[in-house]
From Swiss-Prot:
Lineage: Eukaryota, Metazoa, Chordata, Craniata, Vertebrata
Protein name from the UniProt record: Blood group Rh(D) polypeptide
Subcellular location: Cell membrane
GO cellular component: membrane; plasma membrane
One Pfam family cited in the UniProt record for this chain: Ammonium_transp
Main location: membrane
GO BP annotations, alphabetical order: ammonium transmembrane transport; erythrocyte development; multicellular organismal-level iron ion homeostasis
Amino acid sequence: MGSKYPRSLRCCLPLWALELQTAFSLLFCFFIPHDTAQVDHRFMASYQVLRNLTLMAALGFGFLSSSFRRHSWSSVAFNLFMLALGVQGTILLDHFLGQVLQWNKINNLSSIQIATMSTLPVLISAGAVLGKVNLVQLTVMVLMEAMAFGAIRFADEKVFKMTEHIIMMHGHVFGAYFGLTVAWWLSRSLPRRVGENAQTEKVQMATSSSLFAMLGTLFLWIFWPAINSALLEGTKKRNAVFNTYYALAVSAVTATSMSALSHPQGKINMVHIHNAVLAGGVAVGAPGCLISSPWISMVLGLIAGLISIWGAKCPRACLNHMLQNSSGIHYTFGLPGLLGALTYYCLQIVTEPKSSDLWIITQTVTHIGALSFAVAMGMVTGLLTGCLLSVRVWRAPHAAKYFDDQTFWEFPHLAVGF
């Protein structure tokens, strides 16, 4: 008997997605004007930054999630769908918040750039649930997470007085814990043995898919300095670019060597390479602009690589079922992001020449408060989103259909009745 799930998706997805896109188009028509500023060298520089960010988001994160043997098509295509939807929603959210809160923000190429960076937490968190939800559920998740991260950006800017650069770096941590919380809640509704048996065979890696995932890793590795320096200028931008490359280089070497060391026969695990080589770039994202000597960023890359390998290898058996961390976002983005945020705080305290006790206390409260707020928002809104996605109206796939492209895609060479 054929599966009834594709029929429910046929009824639900076009109606929901097209209505949402029509609403977005009408809102853009009446409220979002084109930028009329003259095109100059600054426009082209902004476009180059936007191009690099889009390559990272579309190709890097898309292929990074394609390592599952029977879920590679969905990982790449759903990632692009979420990126396109998230950028539109974030631009509208920023515009209306600017109108209500009287922010002096112009809708130009920089707006698309910031919207793209604000959508990266969505792509990070999606790594924890891809293969377990359908496209309608992902649409709801994009909207919920975009609004939650918009609230974080507002609170960090107005309450904690954080710069836009640091706010975006907190997005790595927010996205990681948001996705982990959503995945944890969705897993609660499944019988333990049923969920494990359904996922064991499909989570296994295949050589071809691993190569595509490695391609995504390479895109992210090459272009990661773009995200760490996109919102900076002058000396800070230069420092961020240099230090990101140093940290990425060290984390790549650390990931390869430690992966071999952790195997009884000295063999390298491709999963470790997919994730751990990026940990240095995540860790140096916040403090990179303050680091004036390369050895500090290299040490950060080393520590981040060690943390990532440790997270992938040592506690995996006891934590994986609890955190639902099959994609590794916890030890690729979550833990290195926390390391980077704490390092930024320490460097700011050390590099300030005339720091008083009151200033140190103020900085401690604001930085720890902003970071804690991002983590708490990720968990709370992730829990709410998980509750919402578990409602039966979304026609979620059965556990037997997890990590299976045949649930969503047409395969002409297969039997028609699937």
